[in-house]
Amino acid sequence: MTKTSFIFSTDIHGSEICWRKFLNSAKVFKVDALVLSGDMTGKIIVPILRRPDGKFDATFMKEKYVLSESEIPEFGKKVRRVSYLPYVTTPEEADRIAADEGRREKLFEDLQKQVVKYWLDLIPEKVDRNCRVIISPGNDDKLAIDEVIKQNPHAVYGEENVVALDEEHEVACVGWTCPTPWNSPRECSEEELYERMKKVVQQVKNMKTAVFCFHCPPYDSEIDRAPLLDKNLRPVVRAGSHEFGPAGCKATRRIMEDYQPLLGLHGHIHESPGFIQIGRTKCLNPGSEYGEGILKAYLVEIDGDKITRLQRVEG
């Protein structure tokens, strides 16, 4: 039997602070692997507007800045730390981008690819070469970042594939989810999702030692409870409290029940950290507080077909 340890995290949504903590955790906990289940990228652009006098205007976290050109790199770092994407442009170009959805989406795509490449290039600086870094994008990640991950020599691309955790344990990865209110890049019907998952897990050699890294947690599992939304996508509030309900995927639950792997790694629902049991399968969700720069993760040790350690990690 092979014993291995890894840190699992998810839903860092462009937070460079969380990404650096994730990489640093490899040496802190002396693990054999890091596993990230999307959503990796940020979704908000902060324009840095060039003025005629050579200065630059920007608004960040409701605060206005006037920057010199030499101050832009440091300001950009500050913006990226909290999941936003800095972009230097002119007021005229910013107006054109705002009015053109196609141009806006292309810009998001390009900026996200730049950030992902930069992040992956930090791996050899932070992580021992013998520690595998397995990444499977999530529903909020644009498809364009996949090629960036595939081409990087420091990361293992897992999406819709089965990759080796070690010589005995395999990780089957699917980052797609069932439909959400946000029309994200990787979502589909429950029926299609089940077929996607089934196609991947059928490549697994040994279910007793397998790990399923499915971004969306099982439906109605206590690790999938999210605030309920009304038809205007506003939280439902009753008696002064938010109403919560299940928001996971029925396809995930069905696959877990049918195939019974050793472990299920999930995310997607930030508000529901914890772990549950489905038959012999332990399913966990670390949750996410990326906006506060808090890394939420699990330290996992497995030995053959047994889980020998399961510890919440936050920092």
Which residues are covered by each model-predicted region?
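Active-site neighborhood of phospho(di)ester-bond hydrolases with catalytic His/Asp-centered motifs
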Residues: 8-11, 34-39, 132-139, 157-159, ...
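Catalytic phosphate/metal-binding cores of nucleic-acid and nucleotide-processing enzymes, i.e., regions
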Residues: 16-23, 29, 46-47, 151, ...
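Core catalytic region of metal-dependent phosphoesterases/phosphodiesterases
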Residues: 18-166
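Active-site-proximal segments of metal-dependent phosphoesterases and phosphodiesterases across multiple
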Residues: 101-113, 211-260
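A structural motif corresponding to the C-terminal end of an alpha-helix
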Residues: 115-133, 204-207, 251-262
